[in-house]
């Protein structure tokens, strides 16, 4: 699979986000500029990596839940940064990140193919 190393980058980024947010609350996220900047930066990396992987692997959108939304979120963070809501980012950390990590882990365990 051509995108195996890219998926590994996504997995590492998911682990980094988990580390950044471990033991943190939404109030912490709102009050810590460095945490917000770090989390948003890693989400940009995930979105860009998945954009590249999607170009290499047809069918990736069939096995990664919300692939288009993840890529779209990256675009909002980069181009629409002034409208990014803390609650939206935190909701993605809590609800969507674990799903993405699980699905990427499964793809990597299967050799990366959709």
Predicted regions and their residues:
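Solvent-exposed interaction patches of small proteins and small membrane subunits
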Residues: 1-114
């Amino acid at each position: 699979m051509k995108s195996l190393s890219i998926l590994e980058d996504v997995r590492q980024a998911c682990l980094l986000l988990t580390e950044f947010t471990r033991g943190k609350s939404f109030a912490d996220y709102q009050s810590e500029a460095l945490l917000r900047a770090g989390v948003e930066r890693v989400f940009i990396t995930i979105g860009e990596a998945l954009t590249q992987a999607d170009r290499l692997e047809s069918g990736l959108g069939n096995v990664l839940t919300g692939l288009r939304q993840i890529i779209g979120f990256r675009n909002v963070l980069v181009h629409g940064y002034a409208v990014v809501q803390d609650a939206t980012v935190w909701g993605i950390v809590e609800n969507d990140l674990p799903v993405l990590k699980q699905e990427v882990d499964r793809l990597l365990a299967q050799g990366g193919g959709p």
